[in-house]
Amino acid sequence: MDVCVLFHLIVFCILISHISSECFPGCSCGTDRHGRSLTCMETALTGIPDGLPEDLTKIRIEKSQLSELPEAVFSHVKALKHLWLNFNDIAIINIKSLEGLANLTELRLQGNKLRSVPWTAFEETPNLKILDLKHNRIDALPEHALKFLPGLTYLDLSSNQLSVISKDVFLNWPLYHSENKHEKPSASNVVLALHDNPWLCDCRLGGFIEFIKSLTPPFILMNSYLTCSSPELKAGRFFHEVDLKTCVKPVVSAPVITITAPLGGNVTLTCSASARPEAVIRWIYALKMLRGFRDILSHVDEDTISSQLVIPSLHSADRGLYTCIANNFLGNSSVIISVDVKSPEGSSSHPSGPSAAIGEENVYIDIRIAKQTVYGITIEWRAVTENPAETWFTIHFGRYDAVKKEQIYIGPGINTYSVTDLLPATKYEICVTLKNQAPRIGQCIVFVTGSDFNEMEQREKLIHIVVIVLAMVLAVPAGMYACTTDAKFNCFERCAELWRNRRHAELSNPTGDRQGTFDSLQAASDEGLYKESNKDKKARRRSAEKIHKTKNDRRPTAELY
């Protein structure tokens, strides 16, 4: 009898053990003095299994195919204390994925594909002590990343892609404040692992390096020999060996700002920029899309770089102003270099090409503002000429009251031009003419850049309030209004009145069309915005008909860099 009872007990225990160890396919469950656990190693799992027991205290799913932690995936496992998800393919953590895990003390996510972490998710885990994120792809830490991790004793961010960290990340850490103020003496050390990251040791990392140098117990670095990866002059050096200076805005200079060279000669424009961190240099010139010039960059010293723009075989069209701009995160600076071309006879040259035919002397050029940005505007123009494949244009641009304006020569087939880096509250004039002709009525736009605009307006537009067109505009972007110089009344007063009427209409009908069009401008002209003689109307009507015939022609464009 006793043997039968013993046999049944053994069978029962085996069944219970089998059921317990095979709780999920490919996984095993167990119970020890710490509670019940689930272990899944090298399985084909692509997601967290459904129906997890509520009394689990430890979950370990490693070397599987998890790619995401969905919202509230562990919310019903409220007893969970240890969560190991190492060596999976996790790239996304939902901001609410840790919901309900108030008892979680350990989270390990080593060897995944995380580029960022939703740090506010840790508001759900106030008792977290261990956070292991090593061997991921994290490349940035926001200043308040550690705000909801007041009880950490181990933070591992080693072997990620961190290059720059603000010292405020740790200065804003509640644990750092409490330890420094001795509010709660720590029962254990706080271990930080930050090694094996591609640290960029320029002025932006200065505060963090000083913080690392000042660390004292209970804060301990797992590896105190943090190493610079860049820039080249500091690569391989330890943090304690580098002394970083404060960041400064670029200062640009040029040894020569006026260059005159013969037609066909080679010209090299040079500018230097001193900045911390190192500035990025770019050249702005009108014909960038037409001709590819070579830009040679070299380092003068740790803070200074030099750029050389090589113009091979100087053409007449290369004559003009070249701007060297250097910028870093603090701002930008520029210098303008003037290039003139001498003809074989010794006089200044202008774009070559056949002389304007008598019929082209009075060609009507339709010019309009096509785009506006925070930094400038883009204009477009149309003109019907006898030989469009050989027709050159001249852009005249500068402040409205400037005696001499910059001239930029545009080759055949180009019908757009952009200007950037405009000053606020400044009146500018831009004209488009044939070859070297002087601007005439209908070929210019005068515009005033805005000032005192709020942040939303700054994102939407820079140029606003008024655009003065010397003859006629076919389309005007939102926020711009047109007047003509031959109006019989005060143009600015009329534009201001139109602006008030438009704002009133927009407030009354917020879903209405906000884009100014030729139709709306034409209606305004009928009310007296401008008047024309019958002769001018007939001439423009003929030009408009020609333009309409070529409306669908392909027009390559060149953008200002």
Curated annotation (Swiss-Prot):
Which Gene Ontology BP terms does the record give? camera-type eye development
Which sections of the protein are LRR repeats? 55-76, 79-102, 103-124, 127-150, 151-172
Disordered as annotated region, ranges: 507-561
Residue ranges of the TM segments: 462-482
Give the disulfide map: C271-C324
Where does the signal peptide begin and end?
Answer: 1-21
Q: Domain Fibronectin type-III, which positions?
A: 364-449
Compositionally biased region (Basic and acidic residues): 528-547
Q: Name one Pfam family in it.
A: LRR_8
Bias class Polar residues marks the residues at 508-523
Q: What is its main location?
A: membrane
| Compartment(s) of residence | Membrane
Q: PANTHER family from the entry?
A: LEUCINE-RICH REPEAT, IMMUNOGLOBULIN-LIKE DOMAIN AND TRANSMEMBRANE DOMAIN-CONTAINING PROTEIN 2, SYNAPTIC ADHESION-LIKE MOLECULE SALM
Q: What is this protein called?
A: Leucine-rich repeat, immunoglobulin-like domain and transmembrane domain-containing protein 2
Q: What is the lineage of its organism?
A: Eukaryota, Metazoa, Chordata, Craniata, Vertebrata
| Gene name for this UniProt entry | lrit2
